[in-house]
């Protein structure tokens, strides 16, 4: 069966190769998409039982029951979307398994009326690992946020263009299977390119360009995007001029958020902030969510349920005596609220009675 599915996938890829590639959406098409879609308000998910995205997807780690319970929490808040990081390493090990797990994820999200934004690649690291490995993952390090997070596909593959043919197959296979899937509302091709890459940053940017090219060859009905996450002109000239809709990350207080938001809105395309919520920095729900609501800019906070990733702590910094406030997340591991007032503000924004 596995061989048959792989063979079928190869046949579909061959058909795609004969099709005319798509182009960046026109301004008119992007604006029409924005008018046809709701105000998106949701969250980034690392399930509480997972320390990283290998843990989320690999055999023995993928946990439908955990997902179902967390999606119920999100649905009860009125959230209508979720952003989830995929992991190339799991796909490479067994494409059939990965695609089935992803399909199950989409089913569960759909049951909770959540649209999905998959993230295909990611350069971020906050602990020692620069490349993902299968099997048992590292345990959380007390006092260190996202200690066990790993990039996808990993810095070694990003820097080695000889491996990019394998990455092309992954991108095209995943998108092809869901190119017209209404459960997916945006394809986020690459999270925070060049993050922690140092002298290898140019390789990240080269891969970003390839990702857009590969995805355009599939020509999905959903928009493509890569976020604006810092002030690096070299990065932003690529991502803001290639994306069909504009996405950005902002962990600043209200004044800084309004400034970045204004710059993004001026580009004339639909805009979604796909990462925010940094309570110690004043980027909190009482001050920031109303800004996104009043402007109609989409909002996706970082974190729903706190867990092994320890995203309540500062990332990449050892803080053994941390006393809060939490950086990210809305619920403790037992699903009790961190701050009931935050939940009330979210429900007001989403229209939940």
Labelled PLM ranges:
Residues 39, 272, 300:
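Conserved Rossmann-like nucleotide-binding pocket used by diverse enzymes
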Residues 1-4:
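Positively charged n-region of N-terminal signal peptides that target proteins for export
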Residues 289-334:
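Aromatic/acidic polysaccharide-binding cleft in carbohydrate-active enzymes
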Residues 274-278:
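Short acidic/histidine-rich active-site segments
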Residues 348-353:
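Catalytic domains of carbohydrate-active enzymes that cleave complex glycans
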Residues 21-243, 249, 254, 267, ...:
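Active-site mouth of glycoside hydrolases
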Residues 7-16:
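Bacterial N-terminal signal peptides
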């Amino acid at each position: 069966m596995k061989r048959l599915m792989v063979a079928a996938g190869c046949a579909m890829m061959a058909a795609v190769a004969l099709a005319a590639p798509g182009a960046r959406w026109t301004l008119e098409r992007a604006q029409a998409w924005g008018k046809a879609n709701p105000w998106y308000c949701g969250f980034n998910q690392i399930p509480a039982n997972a320390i990283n995205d290998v843990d989320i997807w690999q055999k023995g780690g993928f946990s439908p029951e955990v997902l179902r319970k967390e999606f119920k929490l999100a649905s009860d808040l009125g959230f209508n979307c979720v952003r989830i990081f995929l992991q190339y390493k799991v796909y490479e090990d067994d494409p059939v398994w990965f695609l089935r797990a992803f399909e199950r994820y989409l089913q569960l999200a759909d049951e909770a009326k959540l649209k999905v934004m998959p993230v295909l690649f990611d350069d971020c690291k906050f602990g020692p690992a620069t490349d993902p490995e299968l099997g048992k993952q590292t345990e959380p390090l007390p006092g260190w946020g996202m200690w066990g997070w790993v990039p996808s596909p990993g810095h070694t593959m990003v820097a080695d263009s000889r491996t990019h043919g394998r990455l092309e197959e992954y991108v095209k296979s995943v998108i092809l299977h869901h190119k017209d899937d209404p459960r997916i509302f945006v394809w986020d091709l690459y999270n925070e390119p060049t993050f922690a890459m140092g002298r290898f940053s140019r390789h990240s940017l080269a891969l970003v360009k390839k990702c857009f090219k590969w995805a355009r060859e599939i020509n999905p009905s959903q928009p493509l995007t890569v976020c604006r996450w810092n002030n690096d002109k070299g990065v932003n000239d690529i991502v803001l001029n290639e994306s069909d809709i504009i996405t950005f990350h902002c962990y600043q207080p209200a004044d800084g958020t309004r400034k970045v938001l204004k710059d993004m809105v001026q580009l004339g395309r639909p805009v979604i902030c796909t990462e925010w919520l940094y309570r110690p920095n004043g980027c909190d729900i009482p001050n920031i969510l109303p800004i996104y609501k009043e402007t109609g800019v989409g909002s996706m906070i970082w974190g729903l349920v706190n867990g092994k990733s320890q995203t309540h702590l500062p990332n990449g910094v050892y803080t053994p005596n941390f006393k809060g406030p939490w950086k990210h997340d809305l619920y403790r591991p037992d699903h009790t609220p961190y701050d009931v007032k935050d939940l009330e503000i979210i429900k007001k924004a989403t229209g939940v009675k």
